[in-house]
Amino acid sequence: MFNLRTLVTLEALIAFAICQDMGILNYQNQNYEAAEKYYNSILSTDSDNSEAHFGKGSSLFMQDDIKNAEIKFNESLASSETLLKSKAFYNLGNISYKNKKLNDALQFYKKALELNPNDDEARYNYEFIKYQKDPEEKKDDEKKD
């Protein structure tokens, strides 16, 4: 089953965020508001910190603040870290899927896979949505006939 809540990951953030362990700890303990506040404190002094934008986006997503999570994931794309960008694209794919924008979701998962071909979750989601779209496209074709 395609479960967005379990698919939003902080793997990339964990890899980059030795100094941000309080945000990760709060996130892992499902204390998303505290994690968000922690990332806000980082961003108040370092507004270009892509890892903090990503962490805040993940925290916002888990609080169902999808619109602001999307903004933060887009801001984290400024990172030079390939793995972080891949995870940001992955999470933007999750948001697009949640918003029923399947074509956008496919494009985001594709970008995630281009940056990280070993991302099995992105590959699974990409294939899952392609499979979902195929019956829809066949119905549209039948309506035209």
Regions of interest found by a model, annotated:
Residues M1-V8:
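Bacterial N-terminal signal peptides that target proteins for export
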Residues F2, N31-S41, N68-L77:
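Repeat-mediated protein-protein interaction surfaces in helical alpha-solenoids
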Residues V8-A15:
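Bacterial N-terminal signal peptides
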Residues F16-C19, D48-H53, L84-K87:
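Generic helix N-cap/helix-start motif at coil->alpha-helix transitions
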Residues I18-T45, M62:
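Alpha-helical segment of the N-proximal tetratricopeptide repeat
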Residues S41, D46-N49, T82-L84, N118:
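Short coil loop/turn residues that delineate tetratricopeptide repeat
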Residues S58, Q63-D145:
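Feature detects intrinsically disordered, low-complexity acidic/polar segments
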